[in-house]
Amino acid sequence: MANKKRSASSSRWLQEHFSDKYVQQAKKKGFRSRAWFKLEEIQQSDNIFKPGMTVVDLGAAPGGWSQYVVQQLGNKGRIIACDLLPMDPIVGVDFLQGDFRDELVLKALLDRVGDNKVQVVMSDMAPNMSGTPAVDIPRSMYLVELALDMCRDVLAPGGSFIVKVFQGEGFDEYLGQIRSLFTKVKVRKPDASRSRSREVYIVATGRKL
């Protein structure tokens, strides 16, 4: 019965995925994922990315966010990206493949950032979902806590943080942590985010000194 349930759920997800207008548009326009449209909407609302910035992209593969941001930064901008999964090269993106939770990978990522602070940290990280919120939410919260730690390490005063978070236990406390570190915090649900998904995007600007 469980296998049949999973099979039905998987079939429904595939049907929804391939009929999704954002998936179709991404494929038609040569974008790497529908996440491109989520970040475009955030940029239109919050004007985060500007030419010449340095940006850290966590959970970068397959590259939809990096692909969008590299267009906003111009030739003098820089993106340092990391993901457990491989990602095809993008001009202007320094990609590190590895598990962000691993201390050696984190050190390698910090080495690539160097001594200069960055203007934006963005995270689209998510755990492998089991379909059980009691399991998935804590795993997700662990990842977003690590992303916030990255902000504390490398984000310049006045910098911005964009992070995907799944609503559930721990969300309000996490939002409170972000509000203590930034002057302006918004919770966004882009049109390209599926309505039945728990995911939202916290957009925080003006990192406090």
Swiss-Prot record:
Predominant location: cytoplasm
Coiled coil: none
Chemical reaction(s) catalysed: uridine(2552) in 23S rRNA + S-adenosyl-L-methionine = 2'-O-methyluridine(2552) in 23S rRNA + S-adenosyl-L-homocysteine + H(+)
Subcellular location: Cytoplasm
Residue sites binding S-adenosyl-L-methionine per the record: 63, 65, 83, 99, 124
GO cellular component: cytoplasm
Gene3D superfamilies: Vaccinia Virus protein VP39
Pfam families: FtsJ (PF01728)
InterPro entries in the record: RNA_methyltr_RlmE, RNA_MeTrfase_FtsJ_dom, rRNA-MeTfrase_E, rRNA_MeTrfase_gammaproteobac, SAM-dependent_MTases_sf
Active site feature: 164 (proton acceptor)
Protein origin, superkingdom: Bacteria
Class of the enzyme per the UniProt entry, highest EC level: transferase
MF GO annotations: rRNA (uridine-2'-O-)-methyltransferase activity
Alphabetical keyword list: Cytoplasm, Methyltransferase, rRNA processing, S-adenosyl-L-methionine, Transferase
UniProt-listed Enzyme Commission number(s): 2.1.1.166
Record's function text: Specifically methylates the uridine in position 2552 of 23S rRNA at the 2'-O position of the ribose in the fully assembled 50S ribosomal subunit.
Family named by the database record: Belongs to the class I-like SAM-binding methyltransferase superfamily. RNA methyltransferase RlmE family.
Protein name: Ribosomal RNA large subunit methyltransferase E
Gene name, Swiss-Prot/TrEMBL: rlmE
